[in-house]
Regions:
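Hydrophobic face of alpha-helices
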Residues: 35-38, 65, 69, 84, ...
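N-terminal alpha-helical segment
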Residues: 9, 64, 83, 148-151, ...
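Inter-lobe coupling/hinge segments of SF2-like helicase ATPases
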Residues: 98-283
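Conserved pre-motif I regulatory segment
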Residues: 62-99
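Upstream accessory/linker segments immediately N-terminal to the RecA-like ATPase cores of bacterial MutS
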Residues: 4-72
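Conserved small/polar residues in nucleotide/adenosyl-binding loops
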Residues: 1-5, 281-282
Length: 283
């Protein structure tokens, strides 16, 4: 849209309420849509510039990748290696990283988050991975144990009081170098020692306030976001325009493709039966 070919903003505001005809209403809506898009673009650019001025942590990444890969029981895909390059570039820079990793379920995003957390550990920094559900936190904890041994922890609403005290003391002292959990991580009694990296998985399921509280528990930490939700490129620029975006567009060997089905309302009962059958089959 060329602004020179459109009506003025004042004219558009009046015409959207009192149009003379359908064409004038169309032009008014088009002009207001342009105004919204322009304001959003300006705000996102201001956020990007502001974050670019923030002093972050310049992590040392030399040799870390080979050490990390040596522990993997599988080979990485070209897409994963490409994202690793981007992570190393961001984390070694003196400004704070703000990156979104987007990819289908099973594309290998988790190992990339583990790699970023591993870089933080090798630099003597803590890292935290917040997820929306306890089941997902438990799954990530299994992965953390592979790379961090007894220096990692799981903190959720189900954590017993005795275990919670042990974990909180370990986080505060720096003995625990990597922790994953749910919103329990942002409670006021959780005090980190030296956080360098904050990771959120499926961040759209957290409120803005929750994500801000987590990031505020450290001073200018690197931020990594993961999402398996398919987001069109244009929409991602609106939702994450202030972030750098990495796309894991390949699947590891042997992984089944992700199939999406639209089920009409009248076939909902059949869908439930199918889900139940599949669930029992994989128990």
């Amino acid at each position: 849209m060329c602004i020179r070919d459109s009506i003025s903003l004042k004219h558009a505001i009046h015409s959207v309420h009192f149009p003379h005809d359908a064409e004038e209403l169309r032009q008014a809506r088009r002009r207001l849509a342009f105004e919204d898009a322009l304001m959003l673009t300006i705000v996102l650019q201001m956020l990007r510039q502001e974050r670019g001025r923030e002093r972050g942590i310049a992590f040392e990444t030399g040799g870390v990748r080979n050490e990390f890969i040596a522990q993997l029981p599988f080979e990485l895909t070209p897409a994963q290696c490409s994202v690793m390059d981007e992570l190393e570039h961001d984390m070694s820079a003196p400004r704070a990283m703000n990156r979104l990793i987007q990819g289908d379920v099973g594309s290998g995003k988790t190992v990339l988050a583990m790699y970023a957390m591993y870089i933080a550990m090798k630099n003597g920094r803590q890292s935290v991975l917040m997820v929306p559900t306890e089941i997902l936190a438990e799954q990530h904890y299994v992965q953390l144990q592979r790379y961090f041994g007894n220096k990692c922890a799981l903190l959720t609403g189900k954590t017993t009081q005795k275990e919670r005290i042990r974990i909180l003391n370990g986080i505060r002292s720096g003995e625990i170098i990597a922790v994953t959990g749910t919103h329990a991580l942002i409670q006021s009694n959780v005090e980190f020692n030296n956080v360098g990296l904050v990771v959120t998985d499926e961040q759209h399921r957290f409120g803005v306030h929750q994500r801000a509280l987590l990031s505020q528990k450290a001073e200018s930490p690197d931020v990594l976001i993961m999402s398996a939700t398919p987001i069109p490129r244009t929409l991602s620029l609106i939702l994450y325009g202030d972030l750098e975006i990495s796309v894991v567009n390949g699947m590891p060997l042997g992984r089944k493709p992700i199939l999406t089905r639209l089920v009409p309302l009248q076939k909902r009962v059949s869908m439930y039966r199918y889900i139940e059958t599949v669930s029992y089959t994989h128990l």
